[in-house]
UniProtKB/Swiss-Prot annotation:
GO terms for molecular function: RNA polymerase II cis-regulatory region sequence-specific DNA binding; zinc ion binding. Keywords: DNA-binding, Metal-binding, Nucleus, Repeat, Repressor, Transcription, Transcription regulation, Zinc, Zinc-finger. Residues 271-280 have a biased composition (Basic and acidic residues). A zinc finger (C2H2-type) spans 68-90, 96-120. It comes from the Eukaryota. SMART domains: ZnF_C2H2. It is found in: Nucleus. This is DNA-binding protein creA. It comes from Cochliobolus carbonum (Maize leaf spot fungus). Residues 1-20, 170-190, 301-311 have a biased composition (Polar residues). One of its GO terms (cellular component) is cytoplasm.
Length: 430
């Protein structure tokens, strides 16, 4: 033992740094051992407390009354909203609908709707990205076809950002797995629309890394909608196709609703080629004003052989003839006679506003006026002549007013006078 201690002392003299480190380690060991023992003791004491804690909270919870019982099963609940939520599991009621455009899902609980809405609000979520993409595309196309919005305007809030490139071994024509696309695809509305929208999906997959990846899918969607408009399956006449390609001011995009507000139904009822194309027959029945099936400009060839003209009170249909225009307020209209007009006069009489008249209006009959007019009096150069004439009152005697015949125009005064006399007579008798 002495030799070992002497050797260690000699080593400490040669290496003083290692000697100081050994002393520090020896001092730390006794201090660390009590801290470890204290931690183990606290964990051993906390373990039974943690195990007993939920038991203490559950015992009074089970003792609470459950007044709300399910009428369909034996379960009872503490709160009414819990019972209502449970009954929906039996009835299948789903009152909470998703408000995202294009999404038709409904839920029986509000927390399920909140969890589902995170899929739409978070564009980076992997779950449901394909369904979100297809639903937004379907909603945008439906809005364009219904005429509610133009294809190139504000589609960013309707469409999610394009997905990342997907590596797959399937052919390029298949855009994804069958369960990603919605069950109600676009083929039930128009044949071949998926081919037009294929460019939009491919553009969204290929241009996602570029900064213009959001703008390009919008342009592709607008082009697909314009190609759908010019498809011969939706155009039931050759002249309509000619006008669409030549006269149409919007060659690369769909027109707005305001462009054809009064001419959205170009074909008359008696001359339509609905029997030539079954798709046009189906779409003309369900089309609305401004829809793609009826946005072509009106053509005179559609109604030239129409026997029954379109009524004037339907402004959305183009009639076979020009509407009959008559002055709107013809009672105040005073036109000079033709003989009083000359070519040297620069005065042009102002006409009343012209509007299409209905069939119930009577034809215009100018009223014969006698005497001077206010315009003639004001236009006289002399100031003394600019006076209104004294109104001419028919000279009738008082006896004629009281005892005149009933057809003289004073029957009402006669009746009132006789009534007043009778009243005075009765008052005198009393």
């Amino acid at each position: 033992m002495q030799s070992n201690s002497a050797s260690t002392g000699f080593a400490n003299l040669l290496n003083p740094e290692t000697a100081s480190q050994n002393q520090q380690q020896q001092q730390q060991q006794p201090t660390s051992t009590p801290t470890a023992s204290m931690a183990a003791a606290t964990v051993s004491l906390m373990a039974p407390l943690l195990q007993n804690a939920p038991q203490q909270t559950e015992e009074p919870r089970q003792d609470l009354p459950r007044p709300y019982k399910c009428p369909l099963c034996d379960k009872a609940f503490h709160r009414l909203e819990h019972q209502t939520r449970h009954i929906r599991t039996h009835t299948g009621e789903k009152p909470h609908a998703c408000t995202f455009p294009g999404c038709t899902k409904r839920f029986s609980r509000s927390d399920e709707l909140t969890r589902h809405s995170r899929i739409h609000n978070n564009p980076n979520s992997r779950r449901g990205k394909g369904q979100q993409h297809a639903a937004a595309t379907q909603a945008a196309v439906a809005a364009v076809q219904a005429g509610l919005m133009e294809p190139g305007s504000n589609l960013a809030h309707m469409m999610p950002p394009p997905s990342k490139p997907i590596s797959r071994s399937a052919p390029g024509s298949q855009l994804g797995s069958p369960n990603v696309s919605p069950p109600h695809s676009f083929s039930n509305y128009s044949p071949g629309m998926s081919n037009d929208l294929a460019a939009y999906h491919q553009g969204g997959l290929s241009n996602s890394s570029s900064p213009s990846g959001l703008a390009r899918p919008m342009d592709l969607l607008a082009d697909a909608a314009s190609r759908l408009e010019q498809r011969p399956g939706h155009i039931s006449h050759s002249s309509r196709h000619h006008l669409t390609s030549g006269y149409h001011p919007y060659a690369n995009r769909l027109p707005g609703l305001s462009q054809y507000a009064y001419s959205s139904q170009p074909m008359s009822r008696s001359h339509s080629h609905e029997d030539d194309d079954p798709y046009s027959h189906r779409m003309t029945k369900k089309s609305r004003p401004g829809s793609p099936s009826s946005t072509a400009p009106p053509s005179p060839t559609f109604s030239h052989d129409s026997c029954s003209p379109t009524p004037d009170h339907t402004p959305l249909a183009t009639p076979a003839h020009s509407p009959r225009l008559r002055p709107h307020g013809f009672s105040d209209l005073q036109l000079p006679h033709l003989r009083h007009l000359s070519l040297n006069q620069n005065f042009v009489p102002a006409l009343a506003p012209m509007e299409p008249s209905t069939e119930r209006e009577q034809p215009y009959v100018p009223s014969q006026s006698s005497g001077l007019r206010i315009g003639d009096i004001i236009s006289k150069p002399e100031g003394a002549q600019r006076k209104l004439p004294v109104p001419q009152v028919p000279k009738v005697a008082v006896q004629d007013l009281l005892n005149g015949p009933s057809n003289s125009g004073f029957s009402s005064g006669n009746n009132s006078a006789t009534a007043s006399l009778a009243g005075e007579d009765l008052s005198n008798r009393n």
